[in-house]
């Protein structure tokens, strides 16, 4: 296992796929990073030289926000929206979908488990 940005990147995978194990790096970003370092995207992580690993680490640390820094920034943005009580912040507070999705029949994941409402009781005979 190679460590990049405090994440164990699997050695048996291709470099481009291995980089996607880092939070904040998707396939397109991984491809750009590989082009900058001039590493083939089809090369396996275990075949990378020490120099190439150092180059990957330095580019990721200098140009991209990943892992803890990115998570912290996202959480601070959500907290700021909650504090100023804008529409998106209110949706976060109420645990409802933020980006305009319908909630009449869907949004079970966001709203939580359905709560049963008791109907009219039948009289006993």
From Swiss-Prot:
SUPFAM superfamilies: S13-like H2TH domain
Gene3D superfamilies reported in the protein's UniProt record: 1.10.8.50, 30s ribosomal protein s13, domain 2
InterPro entries named among the record's database cross-references: Rbsml_uS13_C, Ribosomal_uS13, Ribosomal_uS13-like_H2TH, Ribosomal_uS13_bac-type, Ribosomal_uS13_CS
Keyword rRNA-binding appears in the UniProt entry: yes
UniProt keywords, alphabetically: Ribonucleoprotein, Ribosomal protein, RNA-binding, rRNA-binding, tRNA-binding
Superkingdom of source: Bacteria
GO-annotated cellular components: cytosol; small ribosomal subunit
GO molecular function list: rRNA binding; structural constituent of ribosome; tRNA binding
GO BP terms: translation
Entry keyword Ribosomal protein: yes
A Pfam family the protein falls into: Ribosomal_S13
Subunit-level organization: Part of the 30S ribosomal subunit. Forms a loose heterodimer with protein S19. Forms two bridges to the 50S subunit in the 70S ribosome.
Family: Belongs to the universal ribosomal protein uS13 family.
Known function: Located at the top of the head of the 30S subunit, it contacts several helices of the 16S rRNA. In the 70S ribosome it contacts the 23S rRNA (bridge B1a) and protein L5 of the 50S subunit (bridge B1b), connecting the 2 subunits; these bridges are implicated in subunit movement. Contacts the tRNAs in the A and P-sites.
UniProt-listed PANTHER family: 30S RIBOSOMAL PROTEIN S13/40S RIBOSOMAL PROTEIN S18 (PTHR10871), SMALL RIBOSOMAL SUBUNIT PROTEIN US13M (PTHR10871:SF1)
Name recorded for this polypeptide: Small ribosomal subunit protein uS13
Organism of provenance: Orientia tsutsugamushi (strain Boryong)
Gene: rpsM
């Amino acid at each position: 296992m190679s460590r990049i940005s405090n994440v164990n990147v699997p050695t048996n995978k291709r470099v481009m796929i291995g980089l996607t194990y880092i939070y904040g790096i998707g396939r397109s970003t991984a491809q750009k990073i590989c082009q900058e370092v001039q590493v083939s995207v089809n090369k396996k992580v275990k075949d990378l030289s020490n120099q190439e690993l150092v180059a990957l680490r330095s580019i990721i640390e200098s140009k991209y926000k990943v892992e803890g820094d990115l998570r912290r920034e996202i959480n601070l943005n959500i907290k700021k929206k909650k504090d100023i009580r804008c529409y998106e912040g209110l949706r976060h507070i109420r645990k409802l979908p933020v980006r305009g999705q319908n909630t009449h029949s869907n949004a079970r994941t966001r709203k939580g488990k359905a709560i049963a409402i008791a109907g009219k009781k039948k009289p006993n005979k």
